[in-house]
Amino acid sequence: MEVAEANSPTEEEEEEEEEEGEEPISEPRPHTRSNPEGAEDRAIGAQANVGSRSEGEGEAATADDGAASVPGAVPKPWQVPAPASEVQIRTPRVNCPEKVIICLDLSEEMSVPKLESFNGSRTNALNVSQKMVEMFVRTKHKIDKSHEFALVVVNDDSAWLSGLTSDPRELCSCLYDLETASCSTFNLEGLFSLIQQKTELPVTENVQTIPPPYVVRTILVYSRPPCQPQFSLTEPMKKMFQCPYFFFDIIYIHSGPEEKEDDMSWKDMFAFMGSLDTKGTSYKYAVALAGPALELHNCVAKLLAHPLQRPCQSHASYSLLEEDEEAGEGEATV
């Protein structure tokens, strides 16, 4: 019978010395509820980025992230955009109630039958906009019945046509009795002043942790030749745009290459409207008036997402497969 020999004292001492010489390797903790995303294992230097937008998360970011850049856009003397904000705010990604103010342009360009409908015939932007607004309101109501909607019509001045209501039928009842008119000016300042009078922005004790009782979102459907807007950025207006619970989405239906080169380009107007969003949280779309109506519907469908839960526009992806990303983005990009 063989008996295993015990390690000699010399061997034990050598093993102890080797163990003491080894540096303990700390393995990162797994991603659990108590340690989401390995938060405790992040480097100290990364803490300086707390509150910054990461990989298109649904938080506020700088204007560079969400601004819809248009090639060839040259600033005009009347364009005085607010400087890009360096303050980055992280808000809770919650589906709180929305107060959606739909601003519909009633300029005569909206009645020109240039959009190509599904059956190949020509229709005007007003008819398509009316249908897509109704679809948007009814779909949002099905998602959350606490959402409220208001309708504002924009001519030379703005008029509050339907007050905030959670009943889609109330808004749709006055949606189709609209007529276009020739508009010489665009009083953008008056539009925002009207919104400020009719709504109140929520305030929370802690923006990063406490969900707001509601958010205010303005959706402007705009279609008219580029013109110098009546606008000056007042202090109350600046506070409204800086509020993390205010969103200004834009759908610009433009005439495209039909415009003369000497005149102000639609790209200038589109870039100016995009510059008003200093937080980078709004969505902006440009659609050609002579294109298919499907593109307009695609843009409105992308606005169904809750502003606090959607990523910044530059990170948004609507394809299921990676190889389809380019084709998917082209559906609503003109």
Curated annotation (Swiss-Prot):
Q: Which UniProt keywords apply?
A: Acetylation, Cell cycle, Cell division, Chromatin regulator, Cytoplasm, DNA damage, DNA repair, Mitosis, Nucleus, Phosphoprotein, Ubl conjugation pathway
GO biological process terms, alphabetically, are: cell division; DNA repair-dependent chromatin remodeling; double-strand break repair; hematopoietic stem cell proliferation; mitotic G2 DNA damage checkpoint signaling; positive regulation of DNA repair; response to ionizing radiation
Composition bias type Acidic residues, residue spans: 10-25
Read off the SUPFAM superfamilies from this record: vWA-like
Query: Which residue ranges are recorded for the region named Disordered?
Result: 1-79
| InterPro entries (UniProt xref) | BABAM1, vWFA_dom_sf
Q: Which GO cellular component terms, listed alphabetically, does the Swiss-Prot or TrEMBL entry include? A: BRCA1-A complex; BRISC complex; cytoplasm; nuclear body; nucleus
Cell compartments where the protein resides: Cytoplasm; Nucleus
Which residues span the membrane? none
Positions bearing N-acetylmethionine: 1
Which residues, renumbered to this chain, carry the PTM Phosphoserine?
A: 8, 34, 54
Domain comment (free text)? The VWFA-like region is similar to the VWFA domain. Its presence reveals similarities between the structure of the 19S proteasome and the BRCA1-A complexes.
* Family matches, as PANTHER family: BRISC AND BRCA1-A COMPLEX MEMBER 1 (PTHR15660:SF1)
Q: What does this protein do?
A: Component of the BRCA1-A complex, a complex that specifically recognizes 'Lys-63'-linked ubiquitinated histones H2A and H2AX at DNA lesions sites, leading to target the BRCA1-BARD1 heterodimer to sites of DNA damage at double-strand breaks (DSBs). The BRCA1-A complex also possesses deubiquitinase activity that specifically removes 'Lys-63'-linked ubiquitin on histones H2A and H2AX. In the BRCA1-A complex, it is required for the complex integrity and its localization at DSBs.
Q: Which family does it belong to?
A: Belongs to the BABAM1 family.
What binding partners and quaternary form does the record give?
Component of the ARISC complex, at least composed of UIMC1/RAP80, ABRAXAS1, BRCC3/BRCC36, BABAM2 and BABAM1/NBA1. Component of the BRCA1-A complex, at least composed of BRCA1, BARD1, UIMC1/RAP80, ABRAXAS1, BRCC3/BRCC36, BABAM2 and BABAM1/NBA1. In the BRCA1-A complex, interacts directly with ABRAXAS1 and BABAM2. Component of the BRISC complex, at least composed of ABRAXAS2, BRCC3/BRCC36, BABAM2 and BABAM1/NBA1. Identified in a complex with SHMT2 and the other subunits of the BRISC complex.
Q: What is this protein called?
A: BRISC and BRCA1-A complex member 1
Species per Swiss-Prot/TrEMBL record: Rattus norvegicus (Rat)
